């Protein structure tokens, strides 16, 4: 993405291929299905579950927050690695953003519910095609535990850093919006 941002800002803009993600197989589509951008964009919307996430203090990493961390990361290897990535590579990436819009759900369990619904819809859409990696309920819960720490940290920190906070209700609708001036 850093390369994409660099190319998109270049005065000597050349066309850019932008990867397209295929959630059904948990990987990118083949290059022939990628988007081609032929002229420099005026606006880029870069979205993702943990876009804008910030590192935690080393002290907060010590306490396990779910069963996955308790069972599989007793020595904090994964937590420290992720935190280091947030302090370095992702901080550099997020510095490219001019405005941060945070879509804030009520809590983590609501996000799990939404993800389960999303997987079910994906299964309905792809069940006849055969090639898919649709997750079971247990798979979704395990998968989401790997992002739980980052997500809960975002619940606390993003309202301080985001330019716009859109508080969502349980039906994905905007309940309230907070606009902050710089």
Task: List PLM regions with ranges.
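Loop/turn-to-beta-strand initiation segments
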Residues: 13-14, 40-44, 99
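Glycine-rich phosphate/ribose-binding loops and adjacent secondary-structure elements
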Residues: 29-38
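Generic detection of short hydrophobic beta-strand segments and adjacent strand-loop junctions
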Residues: 13-18, 37-38, 166
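Conserved NTP phosphate-binding and transfer environment spanning the P-loop NTPase/kinase superfamily
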Residues: 50-182
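Conserved nucleotide-sensing/catalytic segment adjacent to the nucleotide-binding pocket
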Residues: 1-29
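Switch II (G3) loop of P-loop NTPases
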Residues: 44-50
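A short, aliphatic-rich alpha-helical micro-motif
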Residues: 38-39, 94
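Short gly/ser/thr-rich secondary-structure transition/capping motifs
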Residues: 23-30, 80-86
